[in-house]
Curated annotation (Swiss-Prot):
It comes from Porphyra purpurea (Red seaweed). Keywords: Chloroplast, Plastid, Ribonucleoprotein, Ribosomal protein, RNA-binding, rRNA-binding. It is found in: Plastid, Chloroplast. One of its GO terms (molecular function) is rRNA binding. InterPro entries: Ribosomal_bL20 (IPR005813), RIBOSOMAL_L20_CS (IPR049946), Ribosomal_protein_bL20_C (IPR035566). This is Large ribosomal subunit protein bL20c. Its main location: plastid.
């Protein structure tokens, strides 16, 4: 059986890691072992971040809706309860966009919910 030299495979493997480590500081983008560790850590952080982003945006929307509802004399929980009771199917993202961009439409929704 003939000898197999792994030069090309090893170079490709390292190049793949260094490509992902581009922009990292210090030895983290130039030494293979540390670059590989940092890439794995960065991939873990990005995975967790994609999950966290959903929670963070939901919190932001709730905060915006609460602030807009408070300015009209109603709190968030009673507003959402009244929306559900009146079968108004607007999600929190839409409500937050209305609260920040189209205040008159948000006030109209509040008035229909109050009555």
């Amino acid at each position: 059986m003939s000898r197999v030299k792994r030069g090309n495979v090893a170079k490709k493997r390292r190049a793949k890691v260094f490509k992902l480590a581009k922009g990292f500081k210090g030895a983290h983008n130039s030494l293979f072992r540390t670059a590989k560790q940092q890439v794995l850590k960065a991939l873990r952080y990005s995975y967790v971040g994609r999950k966290r982003k959903k929670r963070d945006f939901r919190r932001l929307w709730i905060t915006r809706i609460n602030a807009a509802a408070h300015s009209q004399g109603m709190n968030y929980s009673t507003f959402i309860t009244a929306l559900k009771k009146d079968n108004i199917a607007l999600n929190r993202k839409m409500l937050a966009q209305l609260a920040s961009n189209d205040i008159k439409a948000f006030q109209a929704i509040l008035e229909t919910v109050k009555n």
